[in-house]
Amino acid sequence: MAKTLISSPSFLGTPLPSLHRTFSPNRTRLFTKVQFSFHQLPPIQSVSHSVDLSGIFARAEGLLYTLADATVAADAAASTDVAAQKNGGWFGFISDGMEFVLKVLKDGLSSVHVPYSYGFAIILLTVIVKAATLPLTKQQVESTLAMQNLQPKIKAIQERYAGNQERIQLETSRLYTQAGVNPLAGCLPTLATIPVWIGLYQALSNVANEGLLTEGFLWIPSLGGPTSIAARQSGSGISWLFPFVDGHPLLGWYDTAAYLVLPVLLIVSQYVSMEIMKPPQTNDPNQKNTLLIFKFLPLMIGYFSLSVPSGLTIYWFTNNVLSTAQQVWLRKLGGAKPAVNENAGGIITAGQAKRSASKPEKGGERFRQLKEEEKKKKLIKALPVEEVQPLASASASNDGSDVENNKEQEVTEESNTSKVSQEVQSFSRERRSKRSKRKPVA
């Protein structure tokens, strides 16, 4: 019977109880027996009531994670299953499905003798998920581009109705309605893809916690490294890098440099993506503040990648490269078809949105109407009385139909009709007077 003593830090001023792990070579399972010895603890009645129980539980939990890591490292030959805590929460079913697909891809690549099967399975799964969410990404980019193309119109409305927020909101809403743009359409696809990526992240975390990411990938010593379960749970995920031990990192210079290459590539890819997709420079102070924050965002992501398994960093790097390629295709190469073009062609000018429902009047229409009326007048003057009456009645009927179709021209048409009738009457009186003056021919 072999026993391994694991030392622990002081606990409430006294050492923690002795912990012994027993292993029987004749058994295939691994047992952990904890022996408590209270001979070093003070009497119970002398313990103060202000003991920090939360601190006790936190240290005990950290100790259990340390024991889990020590058990795996002490006896690698005994392939025991480490019980990982799979707390998927609301996205547990998504993470379980992603984990199943990842294992299927890994087994499929291993069956065809592909080296680094787990690393390539992570890359392949990221590509599949990215391709599946491409329609949502395309919809989000199209909505974003349409909103950007409408910004000049929106600014014109704000300048025209400065100080009247209610009118600005009304005109802006009408502008969105006419352009067929929904301001919230750009957010919905992004919100729909968030559970997918959270599930994929949790699936990779579960695989790492289960100890399945033990194989390397290209120059990376292990996809599960460089951190450990205990370091991640205690919040000291970069303890493998700092502090130095005897003047060198804990893992040695070679492995440490190998693990640092991928976070550096991740940071570089983030900056390249930001430079490619950088919006045009403006004098807007809000945009300048946003760009300033984005400059430090890749550094934060790179720092966070130091405290997670390398398998997750591979997923982040692959996802970032694919996202950049998608954005270039959608924005630069014409893959996205926004509802509003770059010049906002066909959209009304600021302050005229209230006329969008009415049909615009054709240019020169009123001039043509006046010319037709003038021709009618000349024709009536040139015709005899017998032909004037039916023409006048026809013109009156036409004028009446026009009045019914267009209320705005009612007064004009009635006045024109009255003028025509007066001219006809005067013309007929003149003809009668001339006939009466004629003498009969002998």
Curated annotation (Swiss-Prot):
CDD domains: 5TM_YidC_Alb3. One of its GO terms (cellular component) is chloroplast thylakoid membrane. Keywords: Chloroplast, Membrane, Plastid, Thylakoid, Transit peptide, Transmembrane, Transmembrane helix. Residues 130-183, 318-442 are stromal. Induction: By the plant hormone gibberellin A3. Expression is induced to a greater extent by short day conditions than long day conditions. Residues 358-371 have a biased composition (Basic and acidic residues). The keyword tRNA processing does not apply. Residues 1-108, 205-296 are lumenal. Residues 431-442 have a biased composition (Basic residues). Coiled coil: none annotated. GO terms for biological process: protein insertion into membrane; protein localization to chloroplast; thylakoid membrane organization. It holds the Pfam family 60KD_IMP. It is a multi-pass membrane protein. Its main location: plastid. The chain crosses the membrane at residues 109-129, 184-204, 297-317. GO terms for molecular function: membrane insertase activity. It is found in: Plastid, Chloroplast thylakoid membrane. Residues 414-427 have a biased composition (Polar residues). Highly expressed in apical buds. Low levels of expression in leaves. Not expressed in roots, and stems. InterPro entries: YidC/ALB3/OXA1/COX18 (IPR001708), YidC/Oxa/ALB_C (IPR028055), YidC_ALB_C (IPR047196). Residues 350-371, 390-442 are annotated as: Disordered. May be required for the insertion of some integral membrane proteins into the chloroplast thylakoid membrane. May play a role in inhibiting senescence. PANTHER family: INNER MEMBRANE PROTEIN ALBINO3, CHLOROPLASTIC, OXA1. Belongs to the OXA1/ALB3/YidC (TC 2.A.9.2) family. This is Inner membrane protein PPF-1, chloroplastic.
